[in-house]
């Protein structure tokens, strides 16, 4: 099973790239983690935010291979703790499909992305900067994988 993080935003600071890559490289070959960056729409004083969200959403959905399970990160989504995420990861593996996790931009996700999702996950009740979410996601997914394989990374 491959996991894709599809995130709005490009040209992240070096610390974001390094943090994400630190966890991405730890994933096993049979469960690679891939990052697909979607160019954010230009947000100015008179920006049409609804149109920007629509364009970003179209680009996100176009990046998802046919048949993938779509999971959105969204405030009203399910709140999974680490053991619950590990259970989700196991269920996704048993489902036999790759997983695409969508990370929206500053205004969140387009309605079309939310409508296409099979699951919605609330990463935190906190508002997190979007660059940091990439690192938190990579680490959380790696930790969940470590639980499913009894790898010593996760300690209770």
UniProtKB/Swiss-Prot annotation:
Main location: cytoplasm
Claim: Isomerase is one of the keywords in the record: no
Enzyme class: transferase
GO MF assignments: rRNA (pseudouridine-N3-)-methyltransferase activity
Ranges in a coiled coil: none
Function: Specifically methylates the pseudouridine at position 1915 (m3Psi1915) in 23S rRNA.
Listed name of the protein: Ribosomal RNA large subunit methyltransferase H
